Amino acid sequence: MMPFAVTTQGAQQPAPAPKQFGISSPISLAAPKDTDRELTQKLIETLQPFGVFEEEEELQRRILILQKLNNLVKEWIREISESRNLPQAVIENVGGKIFTFGSYRLGVHTKGADIDALCVAPRHVDRNDFFTSFYDKLKLQEEVKDLRAVEEAFVPVIKLCFDGIEIDILFARLALQTIPEDLDLRDDSLLKNLDIRCIRSLNGCRVTDEILHLVPNIDSFRLTLRAIKLWAKCHNIYSNILGFLGGVSWAMLVARTCQLYPNAIASTLVRKFFLVFSEWEWPNPVLLKEPEERNLNLPVWDPRVNPSDRYHLMPIITPAYPQQNSTYNVSVSTRMVMIEEFKQGLAITHEILLNKAEWSKLFEAPSFFQKYKHYIVLLASAPTEKQHLEWVGLVESKIRILVGSLEKNEFITLAHVNPQSFPAPKETADKEEFRTMWVIGLVLKKPENSEILSIDLTYDIQSFTDTVYRQAINSKMFEMDMKIAAMHLRRKELHQLLPNHVLQKKETHLTESVRLTAVTDSSLLLSIDSENSMTAPSPTGTMKTGPLTGNPQGRNSPALAVMAASVTNIQFPDVSLQHVNPIESSGIALSESIPQIPSQPTISPPPKPTMTRVVSSTHLVNHPSRPSGNTATNIPNPILGV
């Protein structure tokens, strides 16, 4: 028999079909040109001063630290096995291993970045062992500093600093007698008979490994992702907790771009990234592979089955089972901000392609404090550094709830929270207090037939503070003098709280005063001498000085955690998000079509509920809107925890 197929003379063999990455055919298979290579080299040179590449010496140090940690895990598991009288043959091969995930596993970590790690143990080692005997073993290591266990977290973790490198270690116990060296965590069968905490702990590694297996060229993917992550951080849209995207979500968007342009290199992929996602028809989901059902009865993202999934505005679905939406925190405002940034990025990268701009322009930070005319400033304060660290973490995790509430106001088009926090000026120089601020930019909508806009935000701010205080008390975190403050400032007044180098523009204006007067237990009257207002009562506070103004404040709200912030008599500003049409600004026509997901129904965003406001041009009365038929509903008292 002939070893090869016989063909007719002169006949041409059909070209082998290119491998398809992802759920659709690629948009382009074009190979890189010399100009693409030159632009990629320039991109690398531009990235270097930003510290996105780690020195070889530092990389080797990380590898050595992980080897030491891996040896500690093996030694610890062997000791546990011996204490439980396992057969010697099992003890000799019991194994155990440290896996990494996140930016380090993806190969895009920056200088000084921490390492996300997972300790995988066999079935006879449980979570209690991890948080007791392994914790004690780490405590004995002279290289280990700042060791702390967070057992009650959604994903329990041990945090430490190993020889100067911060490491977060999760734990997963597999239903295996031994842990082999070549264990592939992408194997879905490993999830059988695991508790939900182990499944959550495994998820990071499984998603990271799956992403790396789904991109055509890992080197091009990594360089593109480094550029996009830096761009997102420079443009203040890198924060999962505040409703933007986190590292894994950015990685999946870049991976999808790589799938659509499998032969492209970084300079092209960065530009195509902005092209694809500035035109993406949200809320159609971004998928790296077809979702698969494994019959393990684990909850997965599926808007056909789960009604809550239909309300996700910008779904980016993890490729590993059980599939989840990594962007469930995205709000109307954060999506608007990101889409506009995508359009800006497309316009800039086209200028770079035409040699009209350098790569450095892409990484120029926009002037957040010159972009809007109205801002809400949130301030969290605590008397000690340790309390402040916990308090700030809780407040920050709830800011997106406030943003969502502000978005429902008919006169607020957009509420843009800056992910960067700032130290706040001290209330008094001789008082020890730790304070952090966040700033939310507002785009306001002009009312019909009026040049004056009055908005009462009392209920929105009060609901936000109630939520924060209630969770702090229920989790036993709350301490006396933990406070939240809020105030409205115009752009010209930001200098009162922020230094000039942050504002990037020096302005001088008169300070205006604010008075807060509690009228009754069921209403709150704000007498305002300016267009600013703020309060910051602690849920346990009696009469004490306000954190910013020194004005008296007291425990007068039925919720004990009332904070009123309002904007009144605002002249409508000529401010809005800058809309950039990348086609008009670049003078090109987009001929590429962005593939949409077949078989996936378009999900309509939820309708905006109407909010009633009681507003006066001189004062605001706190009558929170309530559902009809529930006029007697009371806000729970956070002190009593009811």
Curated annotation (Swiss-Prot):
Mg(2+) 1 binds at D114, D116. SUPFAM superfamilies: Nucleotidyltransferase, PAP/Archaeal CCA-adding enzyme, C-terminal domain, PAP/OAS1 substrate-binding domain. CDD domains: NT_PAP_TUTase. It catalyses: RNA(n) + ATP = RNA(n)-3'-adenine ribonucleotide + diphosphate. Its cofactor is Mg(2+); Mn(2+). InterPro entries: NT_sf, NuclTrfase_I-like_C, PolA_pol_cen_dom, PolA_pol_NTPase, PolA_pol_RNA-bd_dom. Mg(2+) 2 binds at D114, D116, D168. Gene3D superfamilies: 1.10.1410.10, Beta Polymerase, domain 2, Poly(A) polymerase predicted RNA binding domain. Residues 530-553, 620-642 are annotated as: Disordered. Pfam families: PAP_central, PAP_NTPase, PAP_RNA-bind. GO terms for molecular function: ATP binding; metal ion binding; poly(A) RNA polymerase activity; RNA binding. It is found in: Cytoplasm; Nucleus. Keywords: ATP-binding, Cytoplasm, Magnesium, Manganese, Metal-binding, mRNA processing, Nucleotide-binding, Nucleus, RNA-binding, Transferase. ATP binds at F101, G102, S103, T110, D114, I115, D116, D168, K229, Y238, G247, V248. One of its GO terms (cellular component) is nucleus. Its EC number is 2.7.7.19. Testis specific. Residues 620-636 have a biased composition (Polar residues). The record marks F154, K159, N329, R400 as: Interaction with RNA. GO terms for biological process: mRNA processing; RNA 3'-end processing. Binds 2 magnesium ions. Also active with manganese. PANTHER family: POLY A POLYMERASE (PTHR10682), POLY(A) POLYMERASE BETA (PTHR10682:SF19). Interacts with GSG1. Belongs to the poly(A) polymerase family. This is Poly(A) polymerase beta. It comes from Mus musculus (Mouse). The lineage of its organism: Eukaryota, Metazoa, Chordata, Craniata, Vertebrata. The gene is Papolb.
